[in-house]
Amino acid sequence: MRGLLVLSVLLGAVFGKEDFVGHQVLRISVADEAQVQKVKELEDLEHLQLDFWRGPAHPGSPIDVRVPFPSIQAVKIFLESHGISYETMIEDVQSLLDEEQEQMFAFRSRARSTDTFNYATYHTLEEIYDFLDLLVAENPHLVSKIQIGNTYEGRPIYVLKFSTGGSKRPAIWIDTGIHSREWVTQASGVWFAKKITQDYGQDAAFTAILDTLDIFLEIVTNPDGFAFTHSTNRMWRKTRSHTAGSLCIGVDPNRNWDAGFGLSGASSNPCSETYHGKFANSEVEVKSIVDFVKDHGNIKAFISIHSYSQLLMYPYGYKTEPVPDQDELDQLSKAAVTALASLYGTKFNYGSIIKAIYQASGSTIDWTYSQGIKYSFTFELRDTGRYGFLLPASQIIPTAKETWLALLTIMEHTLNHPY
C-alpha cells in the first residue's frame, strides 16, 4: 500500500498534477470580531498561499483553511501570538488525495448502462458526459439533453431535461458542481438523475411532481474547472477564464451573478478564490444559465447545490434585509432539513445565506430570487469539516439519498403552492 502511495505521488509529478504533501487544514475558532479581523489580515497575505475552505465570517463560526507546508509555522505563530485557537482537521491533504485516487482507479470501468454505472465512486467529466448519453438513450420519452452553451475552453455545457410532455411548463432547476472541487455534488447530481428515471411511474408522490412540473438538472455546472480538478489541481474552485492584466486564472462563478455584484462578500482581486470577475455574467458558464432562465420564463424553484457545511439556505447573501417570502422559505427549509435528517440523522442548519454562513455578493440564488423565482435555495452538503471537499466516496450515496428527501420536500411544496 505504501508503495502505491509513493507511486501515486511520482505519477502526479510526471503528469503535472499539483501535489499537497504536508499541507494541513486548520480549523480556526474566533472568539470576537477583533479576532475575525485578524484572520482576515491573514487571508490578505498572498505570499502564504492560503486556501480558505470556510472563510472568516462572524464570531463563533468556524474557519477552515488549507495551509501549504512552507506556511504552516508562520500561520500557527500568527494565530498563537493573537490568542486565536485552532486545531488540525486534516494532517496531510495529499494522503486523502492519494486514497481518493486509489479508490477511483480501483473502481474505474466503462459502464454499458446506467444500471451498471458505479454511483459509489467519483467520475471524470468524460465519464459523467457518457452517463448523460446512456440515460437519454435508455429513457427517450422522459429525458433529453440540452446544450445551453460552451465553456471558456470550448467544452459543451449540458443540462438534462426531465419532462412528461409540453413545452415551458412550470419547472424546477437543480445544479451541482458550480464550484469544481466540490466533487460530492456532481456525484450526487448523477445519482439524482438516475433516481428520477427510476421513481417516475413507481413512486406516487414523485410521479405527481413530474406529471405537472419539468425538472432541469445541470450536473457539471463548471466543466472547465471540473476537468482541471482531475488533470492538474484537485483543489480548483473557479472557472478557467483569463483576466486581462493578471496572471491569475478564473472567476468565482458564485460571485458573478447580477445581484449585489461587486459588493462586500466577493473580491476584486483576480488571484482570490472569491474573485467576482470584471462584470456581472462575465463567465459564460453563468451567462448560459441566465439566458436559459430568462428565455424559459417559467422556472418556479431554483436549487444550487454546493459542499460542504451541512446547510440549507435561501436569499439574501449580499444584504441582511429579509426577503419578502422569509417566513415561507424558512418554514420550507425547516421541513426539508427535517426530511433529510430522517434517513441517517444528518443535521443541517438553515437560514438566509448572510446569517447561516457569511456575506456573499453576486450569488446564484440572490439573482434567481430577483427574477421572481420564489423557491430559490442553496445547499451545502456533507460534511462539517472532517474531510471537507475530500469527502470519501463511501459517503456519496448516503449524501445523495438524504439530500433527495430534502429536494422532494421542496419540489412537492412547489407543486402544491403554484404562483
Curated annotation (Swiss-Prot):
Q: Which residues form the Peptidase M14 domain?
A: 121-414
This protein is called what? Carboxypeptidase A1
The coenzyme or cofactor needed here is: Zn(2+)
Q: Which residues form the signal peptide?
A: 1-16
Q: Gene of origin?
A: CPA1
Listed binding positions for Zn(2+) are 179, 182, 306
Q: Which residues form the propeptide?
A: 17-110
For this protein, the activity regulation entry reads: Inhibited by interaction with the S.magnifica carboxypeptidase inhibitor SmCI.
What keywords are annotated for this sequence in UniProt? Carboxypeptidase, Disulfide bond, Hydrolase, Metal-binding, Metalloprotease, Protease, Secreted, Signal, Zinc, Zymogen
Instruction: Relay the cofactor remark from the entry.
Output: Binds 1 zinc ion per subunit.
**PROSITE patterns found in the cross-reference section:** CARBOXYPEPT_ZN_1, CARBOXYPEPT_ZN_2, PEPTIDASE_M14
Q: Where does substrate bind?
A: 179-182, 237, 254-255, 307-308, 358
